Structure formats: structure tokens, C-alpha cells
Amino acid sequence: MGKVKKKRGNTFNYNVDRKKLKRKARKKHAPRIPCETIRNAWNDGKSVAKNLAEMGLAADPNKCLPVRPSKVKDAEEQHSNVIKKPYVLEGLQALASLPSKQTMGISSDMIHYVRHMVENYGEDYKAMARDEKNYYQDTPKQIQRKVNLYKRHHPQDFQAMITSHVMQ
């Protein structure tokens, strides 16, 4: 006996361009390149190795820098190293030369600790090590490192503390 409701078979839509669909799907699922200079110079029609070679970057560092230098270089190898997109290299070098943002800060407890030590002892780290506020029993060298860290992050405050300590 047959089924009450007829099962529909798959139908093919002739009005859809399969080539465009495939290209769109491939582009959608491709990884997003985070670096803007490389992303703008990227050609989707070429392979990764060819794209990077045009930009002057190496896809495989082992092939770029051989272990043993070859004595005679082929003319073809030298000819293939022509950089077609030098602006990518310049952009990456400009990004690399920018100063990095300091992410590590100093906790408020450390600031109070260093201020207390410097206000009471100036730069006498051995006396700081014997202070009763030295809860963690830091050595003079460890205290000096903490003071130097505070100096780097708050140079004006540290200079004001030192001048006030000298005047007393």
C-alpha cells in the first residue's frame, strides 16, 4: 500500500548561477585576514604562496632561508624574487616601528607601598627591607625593582617624592 502523502523529490533550480554561488560560499568561509595592508593587497584568485611572494613575504621560512647557502644561484631564482607589491612591506614595517602600548600597570597597593618606602627611606633599600611594612619580606634588590617600575610608570610623582624627601 502506498503512502498517503507523496514525498517530493529534489528539484534542480536552473535559474541559479552555480559558479557564482560556489565563489560566494568560498569567499564567505575564507579566513579573515586581520592585517589591513595584507588584506587590501590580497588576490583571491591566487594561491597563498603566490600572494605572499608578490608582497615580498615568505610562505615557508625553510625555503626562504636555506640551512646551507648554495654556491651558485640560478638566474631563475633571482628573477622570481621580484617584489610586485612593495607598499605592503612598507606598511608592515611602519606598523612594526610603532611603539607598543604598555598593558601592564601597577596596582594601587604597590603604589602605596613604594610611596611609603621612598618617603621614609629615600633610596636606602637595605633599610626598606627591614621596614615593618615589608610584609612579603622583599629583598633590597626586589624593592629596588619595584621602585624602578614605579619610576617608569610615574616619573613626575617619583621626582616630586625624591625632592620632598631631600628637603626634609
Swiss-Prot record:
One of its GO terms (cellular component) is nucleolus. Keywords: Nucleus. It is found in: Nucleus, Nucleolus. Its main location: nucleus. Transmembrane segments: none annotated. GO terms for biological process: ribosomal large subunit biogenesis. InterPro entries: Ribosome_biogenesis_Nop16. Belongs to the NOP16 family. This is Nucleolar protein 16. The gene is nop16.
